[in-house]
């Protein structure tokens, strides 16, 4: 994913914004924060010490990495991913699977459309069941619950643009943990809400 950030202009725009905003939210809420780089030899024990993992925009996904993340969630972790996740192989080619590709069994989401947020339109938010709204900056995954996904539910719906009323945030429980597919980039405000 580091390679892809350097080459893919779309990905760079999202990852740079999200990483800065996750850091700022953690600092301002006094939430302990650490960077973990997933390598081929990363073990579950290394991830298990973190109750929450933000894997903001993992465009490149391997089966080994997806299996590691699944094991992390099954043992009780919370995995939060953002938009444009899991749609490429290690060689940079798109997978021939619905987005988020190899992560779909974990997320229970099916990305049906995707788009940059239009500067010509009013800002789009996600509205949660309790009426709270979250910022949805830069990019939007327009999702639905994947066919056959068990223990998945929509947490929030888009409020604007042509996809108003469509799922913006989907949660899926797996084992003792859960995965949240947040269909946008991260901001200080929405990270604070997720924490």
Language-model segments: residues:
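A conserved amphipathic helix/loop scaffold
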Residues: 45-48, 56-195
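Conserved, mostly hydrophobic/aromatic
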Residues: 53
